[in-house]
Amino acid sequence: TVHIRGRIRVNSWRLSEDEAERRVRALESNPPIEQDGNTIRVGHIQDSSLRRNVSISYEIVVPAETRVASMTGSGNQTVAGVQRPLRVETGSGDLKITGVSEARANTGSGNIEIESARGNVYAQTGSGNIQAYDIDGGFVASTGSGDVKLRQAASGSVSVETGSGNVEVNGAKGSLVLHTGSGDITADGVPRDPWKLEAGSGNITLRLPPTAAFDLYAHTGSGGIESDHPITVQGKVNRHELRGKVRGGGATLEASTGSGNIRIQ
């Protein structure tokens, strides 16, 4: 069973009271809901004269196994408990997603928050922060301007890019690719697969377990490199560049910043 509740709002300062009332009554008598078999489409107002200066907020309750694709030109969206692949988009607004399987979230301008996902997650915003917690799969995120924070709960590849903002990843258990044009990068986890971290301008901090074994390449254009882990250095020792093996070597760990310090803890 699907339950749909809508709240109609009319910008009455641009319309007469009678015209505003007419539009509300027209939408109430013929709500923008279409059903074709098992597919339900909500929110498409065919009459262009009714669309102007009118907005509708929806509260929709569906079975957990419903496939949901939700798109709006402007507005916030909250989705919880959907166990089929989910797609959520808004031109401008915040997105909050909780307790889902696979999810794709996109906003032109706004923040994205995702918690407890059992599959892969894809998140993109033109301007805004991205936060994702307890992700049980892969994670791909990008923002033109904003911070990205991830707490990973199970193995999966991670790719994060921000034009300007900080990147923080906790519990990484798979391959890791992190990039920021301007901002700091902080990552902790177990580098069993290749890690590549790049900052145009900012510090890079890695927190690794005391038993971690990996091949290290670290480079900074302007800054220092410090490591709490024993490194068998390969090549010349240089304040701005370090190459070597930690505990016999393993997966490749590459960290580079144009301007900033690199610290391996």
Residue ranges and their predicted role:
Residues T1-Q265:
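Intrinsically disordered, low-complexity terminal regions
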